[in-house]
């Protein structure tokens, strides 16, 4: 699963809209949609915000692990 698919799945699991997350990241809804479609790379600082919001690790978002916890391996 790509990071774009992962951030979409996480958003949907939390019953949030693209507009909700776009406001949090201070970007337009279209920009956030492009992140989820993989058309635009999401900035690292935005990934950090999402990892904190969803209480998951950056490794999970980037599909380096399937463990949802904040600190896999601990």
Regions found by a protein language model. Name each.
Residues 26, 45-60:
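DNA major-groove recognition helix of helix-turn-helix/homeodomain DNA-binding modules
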Residues 26-41:
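Recognition helix of helix-turn-helix/homeodomain-like DNA-binding domains
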Residues 34, 62-74:
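Short, charged recognition helix plus adjacent turn
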Residues 9, 13, 53-56, 67:
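Conserved amphipathic alpha-helical interaction elements at protein-protein interfaces in regulatory
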Residues 5-24, 49:
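Short basic helix-loop element that most often maps to the first helix and adjoining turn
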Residues 7, 21-22, 32-35, 61:
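Conserved hydrophobic/aromatic packing and binding residues within compact polymer-binding modules
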């Amino acid at each position: 699963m790509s990071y774009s698919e992962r951030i979409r799945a996480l958003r949907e699991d939390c019953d949030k809209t693209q507009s909700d997350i776009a406001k949090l990241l201070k970007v337009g809804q279209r920009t956030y949609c492009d992140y989820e479609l993989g058309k635009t790379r999401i900035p690292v600082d935005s990934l950090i915000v999402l990892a904190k919001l969803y209480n998951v690790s950056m490794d999970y978002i980037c599909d380096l692990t399937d463990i949802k916890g904040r600190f896999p391996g601990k």
